[in-house]
């Protein structure tokens, strides 16, 4: 839930971030979010073609890509083309995370429990959405929308630390 919390600290406030911090007009924000989604589709294509032979790089990117995007978005926001590039990278990162984590849940769950495991994963994911929006809201109201992505980045550091310390040894056997 921590990586999803990090994601939604930033993503829940991406529209006002892009308008206020990056200075984008409404129409550009719309197209940047379309690009974010299209980039996610690119991630799906790469996943389909490469995941079976390259589990580890996909897993590492799934854990670290969202945090990297959240970190880069703040300084990139001073230059609109850089902001657009980071948003595309972010779309790739979140879709990679979603695909890899769902695959891992299916892979590690006993066949008879896959449905329950996926339902549990969905519940945990939704907890991350809510907690990310909540934390992002606190940040937005207390110090400004421009810091929501950095708050998400800080949460992603905790998520990465937990993953590399506790979860990676279990996933990689």
What are these regions (language model features)?
Residues 42-55, 140:
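Helix-to-loop junctions at the C-terminal end of transmembrane segments
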Residues 57-72, 153:
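Structural signature of the two symmetry-related core transmembrane helices
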Residues 81-96:
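Hydrophobic core of transmembrane alpha-helices in multi-pass small-molecule transporters
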Residues 96-110:
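Intracellular juxtamembrane helix-capping segments at the cytosolic ends
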Residues 153-173:
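Multi-pass alpha-helical transporter architecture, strongest
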């Amino acid at each position: 839930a921590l990586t999803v919390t990090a994601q939604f600290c930033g993503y829940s406030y991406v529209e006002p971030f892009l308008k206020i911090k990056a200075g984008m007009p409404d129409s550009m924000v719309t197209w940047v979010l379309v690009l974010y989604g299209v980039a996610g589709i690119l991630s799906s294509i790469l996943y389909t073609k490469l995941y079976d032979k390259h589990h580890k790089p996909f897993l590492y990117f799934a854990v670290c890509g969202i945090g990297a995007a959240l970190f880069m978005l703040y300084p990139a926001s001073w230059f609109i083309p850089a902001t657009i590039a980071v948003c595309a990278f972010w779309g790739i990162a979140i879709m990679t995370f979603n695909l890899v984590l769902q695959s891992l849940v299916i892979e590690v769950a006993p066949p008879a429990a896959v449905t329950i495991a996926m339902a549990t994963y969905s519940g945990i994911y939704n907890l991350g959405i809510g907690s990310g929006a909540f934390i992002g809201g606190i940040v937005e109201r207390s110090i400004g929308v421009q810091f929501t992505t950095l708050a998400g980045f800080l949460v992603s550091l905790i998520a990465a630390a937990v993953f590399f310390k506790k979860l990676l040894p279990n996933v990689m056997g």
